[in-house]
Amino acid sequence: MFRVLSLGGYVAFDLPRVVTGLGAILLVGVAATHVYVLATQPAQGALPWYLAVYAAAVIAGCLLVGLALWVGRNPHVAQVGWYFGSLLSVVVIGVDLLTRVVYLPALTGMTGRWDFAPASFAFAFAGAFLALHTTVLLGINVAYPQRQLWED
């Protein structure tokens, strides 16, 4: 199964800084969508306290993990950042699906609505980060601090 998922090892990219930078940018995208929600939704009606706390935690987490990926001088920090970024992405996707399927107090307008653009963008950014990290784990992409020592 691994051989199929990793495309037999025939497709691989050795761009560790680009892949790591893309991962950081995707996490900043998740944070930006939550900043947008916090900035625009109070004007339309009061946000429930638990959504504001969740959004603030996601913003802080995404920015910290993105900073760890982008600036992490210690290779261990960057590697751990990928796993925390994936964990954060799974949480964002889970909460996104939960708020659209399950009725939550003070979020009745969100239940059943799949056209709320900020949530869709956060879902897409988090999903893209998970997909990118999966390609790193499968060896298709290389992320900092790893390098491929290929010789032709």
Predicted segments, located by residue:
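Membrane-interface extramembranous regions
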Residues: 2-152
